């Protein structure tokens, strides 16, 4: 699936939905390794951005997104609309990230 065909909106200008295939999702659970936890702990004493956790969150979001798009491919979708992310702390330093949306088949609108 072309990542350009994913959107947080529920419509795509110049296209119309031919079929709605249902909800697709990607879920991952991440935990920072001990070295990152220690470095982040020291960095948090000074305040500001904690790069170790930012990197972990970005990797988790990217992985959840990739799993979601693979799920949409399996269903035969060529687009995903209404893409959203959510995160839940499962335990200390362990976070679940989910990416979800509506798998659809879209076609370009006919030119007038």
Where are the model-predicted features located?
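Detector for methionine-enriched segments
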Residues: 1, 12, 56, 68, ...
